[in-house]
């Protein structure tokens, strides 16, 4: 049994100037408290929330007696998190300065500082008393509110001074129970596609990350050349135009849709998801073998870890078990003979050097991940006896294990189930 948390961002209705000024004053006092606590925590090494609260609570209460007392608690939590993050970055040699800076502030609230007044409004405790804030709600909020999710006691608010609004970060939680898996789904993520092996059938989801990355790369380059020529390198207009590009949103949308498809299959079949055991920064390890600047840039932007993280988050939300297998040589070794697969002329289809079988490199990677998961994770999933691998060396043999079913991005990105993404009925599987 695990508890899963998700954050939903909602905005308030535009606030009157007098009411918004109350939150501007509250933010100023909150910022001063956090700055004071962060500098103290880094200087003295006291980064524990409990210890920091014990040492600084009375001082904060004497400095800001007009604030509700629990703001002293939440500022200590905020400062403790910031101090730990700064010291970790400083230890890795990535800190730009020797002391932390508080640039952006989100006001942390606990159950004594805010509450739901109704389904469309909340109340926030300030130095002027309790204030009612009306919310502009959207589809995602109602999706969580009308399901098994419950609103957590903690929340955050941020000020949008251009529109005189509050941005509220609501946390929803629910309890999920993991099931006893009856099989495996192996997933192999690459730069331009992701391969998924389900019940002996391989599906190749075309993500087109390479085209998206290069398209935005050349677009940014043209924008920079155009505005640098007339306005200079640090012009505000160019920055605003570049901020309007939606590369991150497009890639994030594809990641979550792909993760949703994989997890829905696993839930319906009660399977475990098998992923590659990647390092902390797999792209950095991969680019060490390449000198082409454009290829290195593409690998950095391909988000191998990001796709895995999306699958992990979705799996945690639905209680799907996830296991990891060593990805070393998964696309080079034949799963039948444990011998090398020879690829010629940069082809994605290779031949086993011992048995002569033809293998697609993404399909064989999924099979090897599946084999390693079944041999090494000790789960309740079926043993190797149920694994069906076509050993026929004849091209396009009876089951054609080397040839995956390719699904273009225009098909699967519209839907949320694998069955709906298959164009032909003959390719469909029963989910």
Regions found by a protein language model. Give the residues of each.
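A generic secondary-structure signal for well-formed alpha-helical elements
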Residues: 34, 41, 83, 87-90, ...
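Acidic carboxylate diad motif detector
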Residues: 52-162, 207, 301
């Amino acid at each position: 049994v695990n508890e899963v948390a998700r954050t939903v961002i909602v905005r308030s209705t535009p606030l009157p100037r007098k009411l918004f000024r109350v939150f501007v004053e509250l933010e100023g006092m909150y910022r001063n408290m956090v700055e004071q606590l962060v500098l103290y925590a880094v200087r003295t090494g006291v980064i524990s929330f409990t210890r920091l609260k014990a040492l600084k609570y009375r001082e904060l209460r004497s400095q800001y007696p007009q604030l509700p007392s629990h703001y002293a608690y939440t500022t200590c939590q905020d400062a403790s998190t910031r101090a730990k993050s700064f010291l970790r970055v400083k230890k890795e040699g990535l800190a730009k300065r020797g002391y932390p800076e508080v640039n952006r502030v989100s006001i942390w609230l606990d159950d004594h500082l805010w509450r739901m007044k109704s389904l469309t409004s909340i109340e926030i405790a300030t130095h002027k008393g309790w204030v009612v804030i009306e919310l502009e709600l959207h589809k995602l909020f109602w999706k969580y509110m009308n399901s098994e999710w419950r609103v957590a006691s903690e929340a955050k608010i941020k000020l949008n001074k251009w529109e005189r609004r509050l941005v509220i970060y609501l946390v929803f939680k629910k309890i999920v129970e993991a099931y006893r898996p009856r099989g495996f789904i192996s997933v192999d993520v690459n730069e331009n596609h992701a391969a998924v092996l389900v019940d002996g059938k391989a599906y190749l989801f075309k993500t087109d990350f390479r085209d998206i990355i290069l398209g935005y790369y050349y677009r940014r380059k043209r924008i920079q050349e155009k505005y640098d020529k007339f306005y200079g390198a640090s012009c505000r207009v160019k920055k605003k135009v570049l901020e309007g590009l939606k590369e991150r949103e497009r890639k994030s949308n594809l990641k979550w849709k792909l993760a949703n498809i994989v997890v829905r299959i696993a839930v319906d079949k009660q399977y475990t998801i098998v992923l590659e055991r990647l390092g902390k920064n797999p792209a950095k390890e991969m680019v060490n073998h390449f000198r082409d600047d454009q290829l290195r840039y593409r690998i950095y932007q391909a988000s191998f870890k990001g796709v895995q993280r999306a699958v992990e988050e979705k799996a945690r939300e639905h209680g799907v078990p996830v296991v990891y297998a060593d990805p070393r040589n998964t696309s080079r070794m034949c799963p039948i003979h444990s011998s090398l697969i020879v690829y010629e002329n940069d082809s994605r289809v290779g031949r086993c050097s011992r048995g002569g079988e033809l293998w697609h490199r993404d399909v064989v990677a999924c099979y090897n991940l599946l084999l390693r998961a079944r041999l090494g994770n000790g789960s309740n999933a079926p043993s190797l006896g149920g694994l069906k691998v076509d050993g026929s060396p004849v091209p396009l043999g009876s089951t054609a294990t080397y040839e995956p079913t390719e699904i273009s991005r225009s098909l699967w990105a519209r839907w949320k189930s694998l069955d709906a993404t298959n164009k032909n009925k003959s390719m469909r599987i029963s989910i």
